């Protein structure tokens, strides 16, 4: 890993610091502009020293998506530039601030609980339901039409950008995570590009994604849930591992009237497909079910440390 990560050094002086500090310092500016600038600089240095996580926000122009993509980068400040680093891509990156992701990482790295990772949180665009989904199959409402373009953005624009910007030739490993529809997207990309990844982390994923309306008389769970079909018809990649999280309060729908909400049913059925494909429940799959978990950022934030320690925990 090259010197590109030196660019992170003062990015700890990000939105969180600006909100907390600049309002208090602004009144000094009119009296002593030089002092004001020095004080800001010293505050930034102090914040950078206190936090073990460095951040950077960038905007990447995508030709595939025809939009500017907002991306947040998170990286542990204490990592040597010679250490191999893993990459975790995260869909719905706009939720990281609400999740207090920075604080989650601060605690995990302060307590030396996880290995070095570069976290890349990709903000969703206005056409989220078109860009996320399954790249080879539209759902019954033709949603997910831009999922192939989103996949191209990841591999042909984002990954080359990361390698160039931070002087990283190769990563120790790559993983993809996401929430709700972003979880479906992450799993779909990992499953269809297994040579690029080692892990998928899906939180309350939209595994109901189907090719036929459930109210259609011909609808059949076994035939029309798209991701389940992809796994059933796909190839076994023995190095892949899967983290799946659900909450008992994710929703109230129970389409087959078996007393189990659809979110959990769909996830457990997907695990069965993975096991049938050859994945071991103990070695390759981690299922986390939160009894009081909702379909919200707070719940996913509670599950996030479990996911990170499962995937990259220091033994």
Label for each model-derived stretch:
Residues 9-12, 20, 24, 288:
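Helix-centric, low-specificity signal for extended rod-like, repetitive segments
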Residues 4, 24-25, 280-281:
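Short, solvent-exposed coil/turn linker segments
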Residues 18-19, 31, 298:
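Intrinsic structural disorder/low-complexity segments
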């Amino acid at each position: 890993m090259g010197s590109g990560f030196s660019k992170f050094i003062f990015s700890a002086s990000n939105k969180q610091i600006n909100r907390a500090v600049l309002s208090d310092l602004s009144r000094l500016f009119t009296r002593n502009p030089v002092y004001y600038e020095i004080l800001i600089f010293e505050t930034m240095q102090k914040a950078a020293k206190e936090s073990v996580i460095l951040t950077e926000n960038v905007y990447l122009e995508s030709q595939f998506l025809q939009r500017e993509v907002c991306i947040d980068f998170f990286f542990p400040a204490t990592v040597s530039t010679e250490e191999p680093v893993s990459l975790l891509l995260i869909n719905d990156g706009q939720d990281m601030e609400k999740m207090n992701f920075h604080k989650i990482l601060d605690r995990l790295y302060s307590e030396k609980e996880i290995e070095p990772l570069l976290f890349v949180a990709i903000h969703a665009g206005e056409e989220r339901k078109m860009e996320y989904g399954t790249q080879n199959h539209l759902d019954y409402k033709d949603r997910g039409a831009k999922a192939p373009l989103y996949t191209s953005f990841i591999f042909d624009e984002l990954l080359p950008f990361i390698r160039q910007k931070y002087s990283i030739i190769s990563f120790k490993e790559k993983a993809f995570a996401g929430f709700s529809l972003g979880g479906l997207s992450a799993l779909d990309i990992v499953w269809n590009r297994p040579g690029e990844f080692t892990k998928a982390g899906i939180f309350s994923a939209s595994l109901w994604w189907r090719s036929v309306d459930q109210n259609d008389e011909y609808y059949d769970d076994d035939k029309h849930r798209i991701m389940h079909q992809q796994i059933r018809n796909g190839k076994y990649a023995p190095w892949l591992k899967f983290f799946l999280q659900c909450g008992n309060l994710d929703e109230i729908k129970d389409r087959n009237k078996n007393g189990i909400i659809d979110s959990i049913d769909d996830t457990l059925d997907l695990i069965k497909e993975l096991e049938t494909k050859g994945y071991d429940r103990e070695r390759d799959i981690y299922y986390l079910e939160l009894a009081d978990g909702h379909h919200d950022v707070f719940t996913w934030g509670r599950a996030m440390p479990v996911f990170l320690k499962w995937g990259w925990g220091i033994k």
